[in-house]
């Protein structure tokens, strides 16, 4: 039997990068996946790729920074499928600048998507999970939440906040049958990262004890584990998937 057979999963930011890898892996393991993303073009390409392999997947254009949009998308999903079993809070953006140059808009944009978006999705979707007595919520943090990073005050603040949200929701929802955990990726070879100059990529690899960048599929595997029954007794944890950067 597949590990997520008959499960209904929402993956935010599922059109590209880590979310795309998770969407592919989750459908391969039997889940019906709802991709919530703003990028319709890439979302539909991911849907077509998954459907070609026989997976069950749907694209929904949702701005997770908008509570009203998340609430409406949640209601539509529950009306169609009866429930949502798994939430992967993966959507995120960057607006990098040093604190001296960072604008209030750059700060707020990242807060809205990376932190408020996690709250919006967790609040709307967890209500149904509590009612059913079952749920898995996995939030995407980052290793930079644990050690900081130059030029990313906004991003680091959100990813540290995600860990705090994760620990708090784990306490609030655990007794209701809902586990809440986080994954903190390190340097991952997404399409965007692979376009960086060779010297930058080399310096990133040198910081990793394993000597290489991670693959999106390796982060998706961490999501899959935490969403599966094998992780039923893991709650409030942050799993670093970083090749040993944080140890």
Label each PLM-derived region with a short phrase.
Residues 40-41, 61-72, 104, 217-218:
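The beta1-alpha1 cofactor-binding region of Rossmann-like NAD(H)/NADP(H)-dependent oxidoreductases
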Residues 142:
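Residue(s) in the substrate-gating loop at a strand-loop-helix junction
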Residues 93, 100-119, 134, 138, ...:
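Catalytic Tyr-X3-Lys loop
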Residues 81, 122, 130, 134, ...:
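C-terminal substrate-recognition "lid" of short-chain dehydrogenase/reductases
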Residues 127, 171-175, 232:
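Alpha-helical segment proximal to the catalytic Tyr-Lys
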Residues 122, 158, 166:
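Active-site helix of classical SDR
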Residues 98-99, 106-111, 193, 200, ...:
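Substrate-binding pocket helix/loop in short-chain dehydrogenase/reductase
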Residues 3-34:
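Canonical Rossmann dinucleotide-binding motif of NAD(H)/NADP(H)-dependent dehydrogenases/reductases
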